[in-house]
């Protein structure tokens, strides 16, 4: 065979591989509002940067007539490319080939790119669109899942892992995304669950739709499994690119620093009036975040889940930073089980990848009641406490208003190796709020006062006394628990100056096999 013929054969095979399961199935994919695996990769990566690997791999199964159904690539497109010039590894399941069902060889392809990503220290992005295990392969398919899971575990905290759910993801397949750092789901065509609606109906008699069982809305608002819910695939792929811009390539590097055109010493006079005079009146801490970060650019994580706490990425002076903030606009910013888990997971991610943490505190306490106690608020609150105490990255905390009792301790307090703790003049750092403290300290005397007016006057007097003595930032500052009380409009400048000072921080935890975080 002449070389020209061999080259022609190569080109024909490449074209065959790019068609996946064939044009008819590609058309069906498009009719559902979904892109093909290669179309997704083309949008995700820098133009012309994709280097595909294992394009000619096929499955090895002969049972059930599969020996007569061979497709080049075997249902997953794998390789590497760049995003903003930085190397990433990617795999995208191809629903046009056996519904994207996982085979032994398919898992080998995925494991191969994950292994390579670990060798070079680059992020892995998985695009999931699969009907589950390839039943015809039996235990080999299950073993393939386990091989992938082990690599997810090994890569955790070493390289960033992002999962995009752009179709079905059911049964054992859900565990790979669950082991990654971030999950993105499309609102229209994606779902995740361990057991589908039919099994649910058979086993427990419950009627539930696919969307209500495991759609993007459920997982981004109720379960917290998904960190993002996007309208369509294009938005999701763009989001991955933006997310990676805040994150380092691996745990041995720092996040990319960008040129900052936002003045470091910019003053925000509106911050001097943003805290209401009434301590029980809400405000949205999101307004404070956008006022102090570079150019108001903030990428919120878990936006629609546990809204009483906000987490996400921003920049100060071009430096990537993780922000954790109580939000009084929702449930008064109180900490509950979901908010505690949300905050703890984000803090641990930032610590794993050398991203400094800025905490904005306005928290009245933990949510009381049997519902929270039965749900394990003690353990969930301990997760947030543990995450802050374990972290060794630069940590700057600004107390905006309330910081009471146990919730004060779990939100980046000085004793948990926090580096810099600022407070606004409006800060109230105490065991509890003034009204509650007066009820405890003077409850007996209050009960003895029969005249309502005299009682109210006595309570008001005691509340004022307690506030002046304890519910302020100066009592904590007197003991060195607060490094400085700052004018709100200076917050951006003071945070940046603190972060600059901490760039060379070195701190290590005691040597151990691993920690035993309260799960």
Indicate residue ranges for each PLM-predicted region.
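Ligand-binding clefts of soluble mixed alpha/beta catalytic domains
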Residues: 1-519
């Amino acid at each position: 065979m002449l070389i020209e013929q061999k080259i022609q054969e190569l080109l024909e095979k490449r074209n065959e591989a790019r068609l996946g399961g064939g044009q008819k199935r590609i058309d069906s994919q498009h009719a559902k509002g979904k892109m093909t695996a290669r179309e997704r990769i083309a949008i995700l990566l820098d133009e012309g940067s994709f280097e595909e690997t294992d394009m000619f791999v096929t499955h090895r199964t002969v049972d059930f007539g599969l020996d007569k159904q061979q497709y080049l690539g075997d249902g997953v497109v794998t390789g590497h490319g760049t995003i903003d010039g930085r190397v990433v590894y990617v795999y995208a399941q191809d629903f046009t080939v056996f519904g994207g069902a996982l085979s032994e060889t398919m898992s080998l392809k995925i494991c191969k790119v994950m292994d390579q990503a670990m060798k070079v220290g680059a992020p892995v992005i998985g695009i999931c669109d699969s009907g589950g295990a390839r039943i015809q392969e039996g235990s080999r398919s299950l073993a393939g899942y386990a091989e992938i899971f082990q690599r997810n575990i090994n890569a955790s905290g070493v390289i960033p892992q992002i999962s995009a759910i752009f179709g079905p993801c059911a049964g054992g397949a859900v565990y790979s995304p669950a082991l990654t750092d971030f999950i993105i789901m499309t609102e229209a065509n994606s779902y995740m669950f361990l057991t589908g609606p039919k099994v649910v109906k058979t086993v427990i008699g419950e009627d539930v739709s696919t969307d209500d069982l495991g759609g993007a809305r459920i997982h981004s608002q109720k379960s917290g499994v998904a960190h993002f819910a996007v309208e369509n695939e294009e938005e999701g792929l763009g989001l991955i690119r933006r997310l990676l811009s805040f994150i380092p390539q691996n745990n041995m590097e720092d996040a990319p620093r960008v040129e900052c055109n936002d003045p470091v010493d910019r003053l925000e006079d509106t911050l001097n009036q943003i805290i209401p005079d009434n301590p029980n009146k809400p405000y949205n801490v999101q307004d404070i975040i956008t006022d102090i970060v570079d150019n108001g650019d903030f990428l919120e994580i878990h936006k629609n889940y546990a809204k009483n706490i906000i987490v996400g990425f921003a920049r100060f002076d071009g430096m990537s930073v993780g922000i954790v903030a109580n939000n009084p606009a929702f449930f008064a910013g109180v900490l509950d089980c979901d908010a505690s888990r949300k905050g703890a997971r984000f803090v641990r991610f930032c610590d794993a990848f050398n991203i400094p943490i800025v905490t904005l505190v306005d928290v009245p306490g933990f949510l009381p009641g049997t519902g929270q106690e039965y749900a394990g608020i003690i353990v969930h609150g301990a997760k947030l406490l543990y995450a802050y105490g374990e972290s060794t990255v630069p940590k700057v905390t600004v107390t905006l208003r309330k910081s009471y009792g146990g919730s004060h301790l779990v939100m980046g307090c000085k004793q948990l190796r926090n580096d810099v703790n600022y407070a606004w003049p409006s800060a109230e750092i105490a065991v509890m709020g003034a009204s509650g403290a007066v009820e405890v300290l003077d409850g007996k005397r209050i009960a003895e006062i029969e005249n309502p007016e005299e009682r109210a006057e006595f309570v008001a007097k005691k509340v004022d006394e307690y506030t002046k003595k304890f519910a302020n930032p100066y009592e904590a500052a007197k003991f060195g628990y607060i490094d400085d009380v700052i004018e709100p409009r200076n917050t951006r400048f003071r945070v940046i100056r603190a972060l600059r000072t901490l760039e060379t921080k070195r701190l290590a935890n005691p040597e151990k096999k691993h920690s035993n975080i309260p799960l």
